[in-house]
Amino acid sequence: MATIPMPDGGTMEAFVALPEAGRGPGALVLMEIFGVGPYIRRACERLAELGYVAMAPDLYRRVEPGLELPHDEEGLGQAMQAAQRLDSQGAVEDATVALDALRSLPEVTDGAAAAVGFCLGGRLAYGLAVAADPDAIVCYYGSGIADALDQAGEIRCPALFHFGGGDQFIPRSDAERVRAVVAERPDWEIAIQEDGGHAFDNHEAPMFYRPEATARAWELTRDFLARAVPTGAR
């Protein structure tokens, strides 16, 4: 764990996973609506296994610090309420501070850092790329990205967007709008897993998890990050 001093005088806790080598580029993991729980911690560990220093900040610190909700129907309802209470601009500001903190860690080589966001975090990763300068972003089923495509020109880094073909919360038309913009950016990529819905990567949520879609998307994420923010490890 790491404690990040914040500009407002408070602090923000963050989970940190180190690669076997002890050093590597950074990967800022932006949480889903359930908070920094087992799934997000495991996402950090998966990235650490690829050679990244992974950090997941508690972006609910302005709502309820340390909020971690179960991946079941009751938890989903509570998580959606918590996400509605979250100020998106404030969360992007907190993510920007976390990105700087990650880059300043002695274990992070050359200050290089990507952002990888899931669900809520996918949208926040996009917002972070507008507001700051991550070296790359990976956005897993980020709702609201299609409505912020007018800001795409402000993003200067490579980007990979994942969507599920059967997403219950993001219309297919939104994914297609993102695809149209991606076609104009040679450093942007999009993948739609037709057999996946929303949160298909979430192994903690049986109602959403689709292992085949997860495996394909993770391979794309791995290869994208290897090109955009290489670690030297495979």
Language-model segment annotations:
Residues 1-234:
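N-terminal cap/leader regions of alpha/beta-hydrolase-fold enzymes
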